[in-house]
């Protein structure tokens, strides 16, 4: 159950990564549309046939998805989403990180001290 809880905590970061990758992909695909295609004799290798077939299969899916999500790519919508994401997840990241580091340090010191032989470390109460 804790594994599922950890994955749910990572979901906002994963969504942000997917969103950024989608933005990059959309920008690159627009840049590739402007560049001319390579001459036909360079397309004769087996791997270029595979990549050509994959592009042929995936291009309609990518275009449909881009068309459906066009409203989201507008600057105001994207800026609003990023501001909301920052407010919800990243604004207090510094204090949360400091608290986590202190808690982890204390926990690690306690575990280390409990593993240390009494002759070397002494009693906990002696400090």
Curated annotation (Swiss-Prot):
Keywords: Glycoprotein, Lipid transport, Secreted, Signal, Transport
Main localization, broad class: secreted
UniProt keyword Glycoprotein, yes or no: yes
Glycosylated sites: 63
Signal peptide start-end: 1-27
Pfam families from the UniProt entry: APOC4
GO cellular component terms, semicolon-separated: high-density lipoprotein particle; very-low-density lipoprotein particle
Compartments where located: Secreted
Domain of life: Eukaryota
S-S pairs: none
GO biological process terms on file: lipid transport; positive regulation of triglyceride storage; triglyceride homeostasis
Functional description taken from the UniProt entry: May participate in lipoprotein metabolism.
Family to which this protein belongs: Belongs to the apolipoprotein C4 family.
Protein name: Apolipoprotein C-IV
Organism the protein comes from: Colobus guereza
Native organism taxonomy: Eukaryota, Metazoa, Chordata, Craniata, Vertebrata
